[in-house]
C-alpha cells in the first residue's frame, strides 16, 4: 500500500483538515456581528467575543474586500471556533472563541522567506520614472528616497545620474511578493559625485538601523536638510 504520509494542510497555524473551513470576502456593509449571525452564533455570544477582544482587536477594523476564514467544528453541529481576518497578504488576525472562557485575538505573520536582490539603472527622466521603467516597486522608490533624503535633492536629479541598490524582498508561499523588507546598501552617482549608503544596525534590541556613507558618517546627522519626498519629483 501507499505508505507516504499525507502532507498536512497547515494554514494560519491550524491543520485545516481538522475543521470545516469557510472562506469568504468582507462585503460592503458587513460587520463582524452580521457575519457571525449568518454562521449560527447568537447576539450574546457575539457581544461576548467583541467585548473580550476589544483591547487587542477592534472588529470595526474589518475592511470590505478583505478575505476572512471561519473554522468550525467538523461534526454536524459546525460550531464556529475561529475567525481569521487578512488585512493584507502577509498578516492575519485570529479571533479564537473555541473556548468561551478564554476568548482571545492575536496577530500573526504568514511564514515568509527573504530574497536578496540587486538592481541598477541610469536616469533617463525622473528617478521614479526610471525605477518604474525598470519594474521596481514603489515601496523601493520610497525607501530609496528616505535613505538619501538628507543628501540628495531629488528635484535636481538629471539624465545620466545612476544608481545601484541591494535590497531584500519578502515572499510568502515562495512566489508571492509581499513587499520590500529593507535596503542593505545603495549607491548613487549624481552630478559626477558618488554617494554611498550602507545600512548598519545601531541597536539590535530595538532593531533600529541607520545609513552611513563610505567614510562611516551617518547620512542623516551629516545633512540635516529638510527631507524630500516623492510628491515633488
Which stretches of residues belong to each language-model region?
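Intrinsically disordered, low-complexity regulatory tails and linkers that flank structured modules
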Residues: 1-217, 221, 225
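Beta-strand/loop subdomains of soluble extracytoplasmic proteins
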Residues: 229-232
